[in-house]
Swiss-Prot record:
HAMAP family: TrmD. The lineage of its organism: Bacteria, Pseudomonadati, Aquificota, Aquificia, Aquificales. S-adenosyl-L-methionine binds at residues 115, 134-139. This is tRNA (guanine-N(1)-)-methyltransferase. Pfam families: tRNA_m1G_MT. The gene is trmD. CDD domains: TrmD-like. InterPro entries: Alpha/beta_knot_MTases (IPR029028), tRNA_m1G_MeTrfase_C_sf (IPR023148), tRNA_m1G_MeTrfase_TrmD (IPR002649), tRNA_m1G_MTases_N (IPR029026), tRNA_MeTrfase_TRMD/TRM10 (IPR016009). GO terms for cellular component: cytosol. It comes from Aquifex aeolicus (strain VF5). Specifically methylates guanosine-37 in various tRNAs.
Length: 257
């Protein structure tokens, strides 16, 4: 992967939404470490008299983002930074998931065109590489989608997180969903931290985490259960489906400790 920072160019009529978010959390950390650069591009600066929208042909209600400001902004980026991989936010676009995030993290330049109003003039699609969405619902604009892309991609770039293991522990990055997490105090209002996590027994903790990852996936997202299971995963999955608890299963598998 290139040692150069991954550059995000966000075409929007609300650039402050992007610049504000870039001052916090993982994105700020990625920028500070030189792994990411975020450029909010105000479409009004590329529009004659600042007009970025107009009425749609065909008598539909609402307004549509004009093609000229977007093409002008695109040309500016190409001339000054090089050709980017272009995303446009659309409700019917490909849903953002961890696999796509990992693919995007390998790009050098990503442009995100934020939709608004009734949409973007279809002629803009000529420069678009991918339509992208967060799900089957409507947002007021694409800025939230753009921020999700920037945040998710930034955190998987090598060197951004201070603890790289955190990435592998993430739901969706791992084969299974995440496991329950706990912190101090050990007991609160009668609710105790599982004794396995306090044991200091690394293999026991590892098995506990795997069991609860699989259990979490079975209960919350059974559609994500992998098909290529290891023998241990098959054993745990079948035990969960049969109604066994972790402690019951562990009694039968003490040889794993």
């Amino acid at each position: 992967m290139s040692s150069n920072p991954l550059r995000f160019f966000v075409l929007t009529i609300f650039p402050h939404i992007i610049s504000c978010y870039s001052e916090y959390g993982i994105v700020k950390q990625a920028i500070k470490k030189g792994k990411v650069e975020v450029y909010p591009i105000d479409l009004r600066e590329f529009a004659p008299k600042g007009q970025v929208d107009d009425v749609p042909y065909g008598g539909l209600p609402g307004m549509v983002l004009k093609p000229e400001p977007i093409y002008e902004a695109y040309d500016y980026v190409v001339e000054n930074y090089g050709k980017p991989f272009v995303l446009i936010t659309e409700p019917w676009g490909e849903k953002l998931n961890q696999k796509l995030v990992n693919e995007l993290s390998k790009k050098e330049r990503i442009m995100i065109i934020c939709g608004r109003y009734e949409g973007v003039d279809e002629r803009v699609k000529k420069i678009v590489d991918m339509e992208i969405s967060l799900g089957d619902f409507i947002l007021s604009g694409g800025e939230i989608v753009a921020l999700a892309v920037i945040d998710a991609v930034s955190r998987v770039l090598p060197g951004v997180l201070s603890e790289p293991q955190s990435i592998q522990e993430d739901s969706f990055q791992n084969r299974w969903l995440g496991y329950p997490v706990y912190t101090r105090p050990r007991e609160y209002r009668g609710m105790k931290v599982p004794e396995e996590l306090l044991s200091g027994h690394h293999k026991l903790i590892e098995l506990w985490k795997l069991w609860h990852r699989i259990e979490n996936t079975v209960k919350k997202r059974p559609d994500l259960i992998p098909k290529d299971l290891t023998e241990l995963e098959k054993d745990i999955l079948n035990s969960i489906l049969s109604g066994k608890s972790f402690k019951e299963w562990l009694k039968e598998h003490k040889h794993l400790l």
